Amino acid sequence: MTAEIAVLGGGAWGTALAQMLASDGQDVLLWARESEVVAEVNADHLNSIYLPGARLAENIKATGEVSDLSAIPTLLVVTPAQHMGAVLKTLPENPRDLVLCSKGIEQDTGRLMNDVAAEACPDSEIAILSGPTFAHEVAAGLPTAVTLACSSREQWERLKPLIARPAFRPYYSDDVSGAEIGGAVKNVLAIACGVVDGLGLGQNARAALIARGYAEMLRFGEALGAQAETLAGLCGLGDLVLTCSSTSSRNFSLGKALGEGRTAADLMADRTTVAEGAYTAPVLAELAEAKGVDMPIVQAVNRIIAGADAQAVVAQLLARPLRAEHESDA
């Protein structure tokens, strides 16, 4: 197999992206850490561990050897955010284009993923693919639109024919950090919406939380230099609406279980898949405080993940002083 594009990460999202890329007949190499995933993809064209029920294209080949990624110019990186840097440092060479598809903030350093990738692969040009996407829908070929934030117009021109498909539409942005911030903050807000659902607080409360959470996303984005129009698009508001309203979201499902009384420690120990928001919440809360950004919903999620009673934390949120909806009206 001579592939022009490879996917690094054999979880649900990585497998779905490989399936989407392979839909036009091009060869796709899928790197997975788990030997059982590699074996099943190659022998049976399935990934029953992470994407059950999806029959994979025969032009997807799986490997567990990073050396097989050598000389492939474009790499979609779909490893868990907290392990991305370590995995990228094992690559035999820096690919021309790294497209980061994981959403999160590095816990130990507070860095966005593009900064982590730039250190690990200094010779690569970095792009961000982010938006309202459920893996099972992308794998099934259902219509999907995403933000593809690129480091240059030249990179966009290279990547769009490789990634765009009739049912998978990337939209160009030059705001790489903004595209990342939307996805990372959204994960934490999705946990909050799940908590509201788990507590049985109703649809009104969820809608209010989405709107006020979006305001927090905008404030944090502004503090880090993101463009407001980026966060109003697919990678911000679009992703927020999708994942704050469905149990198909791992972060929403985690929050729902927290609202129902389970602890974060127990839930994270039981999970096969990663709910990135649980790892992002503590570092996001710390960054917001350090930068003087008011993010009460994010702070509330962080307290609940740390073990605080969800009902009590929500009561504290509802007891906050009344204020103008927009800071410009204050």
Curated annotation (Swiss-Prot):
The protein's annotated pathway: Membrane lipid metabolism; glycerophospholipid metabolism
SUPFAM superfamilies with a match to the protein in the record: 6-phosphogluconate dehydrogenase C-terminal domain-like, NAD(P)-binding Rossmann-fold domains
Binding site residues for NADPH: W13, R33, K103, A135, R250, V274, E276
Which enzyme class, named as a word?
A: oxidoreductase
Recorded catalytic reaction(s): these are: sn-glycerol 3-phosphate + NAD(+) = dihydroxyacetone phosphate + NADH + H(+); sn-glycerol 3-phosphate + NADP(+) = dihydroxyacetone phosphate + NADPH + H(+)
Check the record and name the Pfam families matching this protein: NAD_Gly3P_dh_C (PF07479), NAD_Gly3P_dh_N (PF01210)
Record-given protein name: Glycerol-3-phosphate dehydrogenase [NAD(P)+]
Source species: Erythrobacter litoralis (strain HTCC2594)
